[in-house]
Amino acid sequence: MSQTHFGFQQVDEREKAGKVAGVFHSVASKYDVMNDLMSGGMHRLWKMFTIAQAAVRPGYKVLDIAGGTGDLAKAFARQAGPTGEVWLTDINESMLRVGRDRLLDAGVLTPTCLCDAEHIPFPNAYFDVVTVAFGLRNMTHKDRALAEMRRVVKPGGKVMVLEFSKVWQPLEKAYDVYSFKVLPWLGSKVAGDAESYRYLAESIRMHPDQETLKQMMEQAGLDSVEYFNLTAGVVALHVGRRL
């Protein structure tokens, strides 16, 4: 029976998806507020950088995986315009519902899909850009998900992974205090849920570092993989291409 990690716990692979789903069902309604508090608003700048690097043009087809509350999909839909096609997807129904409603409130009409990134329900070589922001670390089989992203992106297209990463070494101790003391406290006070935010902190520590993720993307068949460290490596944006 194969094991994987759920935060710092070892669990059966078949259990992880359900446990992660429970976390995001719990945090969905407060997700944006908590992101602002946790990052001091920096998550908006990280996403803006990702949007700029994506360089979506009118007519592009874009897939946003684990798109959550729709920040990236909203920007991409406006850039792709009426001739483009932007899909907001998430494996979690609660998160997808929040994202869909926020897009509608912003006047953005774009399709949504309940989607497991390890089994993407789209044809080969369909999208110009595929993005996943703060979602890859929660996936049970990251290698399968990356291979699926590579499968559905067109030759010449980009696969982009925005994710928490390995912070600059001199900041590690302070970052640990923030992650394991302050973050669960914020989760308790603002969202009434310390445990979910403790899991989020643990999942960040268990996620591959910058070089390891680069190698995983290359092993998935992506070329010219590069990464950009943001905020001293708290977050990294990895970009790979299908040639």
UniProtKB/Swiss-Prot annotation:
HAMAP family: MenG_UbiE_methyltr. GO terms for biological process: aerobic respiration; menaquinone biosynthetic process; methylation. It comes from Ralstonia nicotianae (strain ATCC BAA-1114 / GMI1000). The keyword Methyltransferase applies. This is Ubiquinone/menaquinone biosynthesis C-methyltransferase UbiE. Keywords: Menaquinone biosynthesis, Methyltransferase, S-adenosyl-L-methionine, Transferase, Ubiquinone biosynthesis. It catalyses: a 2-demethylmenaquinol + S-adenosyl-L-methionine = a menaquinol + S-adenosyl-L-homocysteine + H(+); a 2-methoxy-6-(all-trans-polyprenyl)benzene-1,4-diol + S-adenosyl-L-methionine = a 5-methoxy-2-methyl-3-(all-trans-polyprenyl)benzene-1,4-diol + S-adenosyl-L-homocysteine + H(+). GO terms for molecular function: 2-methoxy-6-polyprenyl-1,4-benzoquinol methyltransferase activity; demethylmenaquinone methyltransferase activity. S-adenosyl-L-methionine binds at T69, D90, D116, A117. Its EC number is 2.1.1.163, 2.1.1.201. Transmembrane segments: none annotated.
